[in-house]
């Protein structure tokens, strides 16, 4: 099904074209990072991948939180604690990224933890074809220990970055594509900052 050619869809088609130029076949993982609006952007990006005929799956790092007690070790809602302790990257790799990359009949999970109820979710395993796309959204996906996991990354620059993340990960410098999504109807690509 062809999506209507709105400014947003046209911008997303361009991004899909760029990603496919980088990784035309095989298992492809695209990260959508940013402080806000990542879920809606990633949902729409996944739809455009589907429109192009790709077997596309969606996940959010928000479904890989750590238990509340572990997230608040440095105090409730501290910026450092939020950056360092919010997400369970080991589980993200073990049940989603690594099995997705294995291809074949290996199953993967797109969620592992329910933050609102503070409990693990029941395992729901998915499989995909050899040329599948996984679009994952959320904060801090371009941190140093994750950035090599993605075939491509989109950084939404419509929200101020958290200082510790910006300082440590420099997401604007490593993202494949920068997008200002402050007007969701008409997202605009942003030029990469000059190197210092």
Task: Map each language-model feature to its residues.
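Conserved nucleotide-sensing/catalytic segment adjacent to the nucleotide-binding pocket
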Residues: 57-60, 65-117, 133
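NTP-dependent small-molecule kinase module
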Residues: 3-22, 148, 166-196
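Glycine-rich phosphate-binding P-loop
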Residues: 31-47
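ATP-dependent NMP and nucleoside kinases share a basic, alpha-helical "lid"
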Residues: 117-159
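Pre-Walker A (Motif I) flank of P-loop NTPase domains
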Residues: 24-30, 131
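Conserved beta-strand scaffold positions in the cores of enzyme catalytic domains, especially
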Residues: 56-58, 153-155, 176-178
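A glycine- and Lys/Arg-enriched "phosphate-lid" helix/loop adjacent to the NTP-binding pocket
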Residues: 76-83, 145-170, 190-194
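Post-Walker A helix-loop "phosphate-sensing" segment adjacent to the P-loop in P-loop NTPases
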Residues: 47-57
């Amino acid at each position: 099904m062809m999506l209507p050619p709105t400014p947003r869809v046209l911008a997303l088609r361009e991004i899909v074209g760029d990603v496919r130029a980088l990784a035309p076949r095989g298992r492809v993982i695209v990260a959508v990072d940013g402080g806000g609006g990542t879920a809606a952007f990633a949902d729409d990006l996944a739809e455009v991948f589907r429109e192009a005929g790709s077997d596309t799956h969606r996940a959010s790092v928000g479904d890989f939180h750590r238990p509340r007690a572990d997230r608040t070790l440095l105090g409730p809602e501290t910026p450092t604690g939020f950056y360092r302790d919010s997400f369970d990257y080991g589980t993200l790799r073990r049940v989603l990224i690594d099995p997705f990359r294995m291809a074949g009949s290996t199953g993967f999970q797109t969620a592992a933890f329910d933050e609102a109820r503070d409990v693990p979710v029941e395992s729901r395993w998915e499989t995909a074809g050899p040329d599948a796309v996984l679009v994952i959204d959320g904060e801090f996906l371009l941190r140093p220990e994750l950035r090599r996991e993605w075939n491509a990354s989109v950084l939404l620059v419509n929200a101020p970055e958290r200082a510790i993340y910006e300082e440590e990960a420099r997401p604007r410098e490593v993202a494949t594509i920068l997008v200002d999504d402050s007007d969701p109807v008409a997202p605009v690509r942003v030029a990469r900052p000059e190197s210092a």
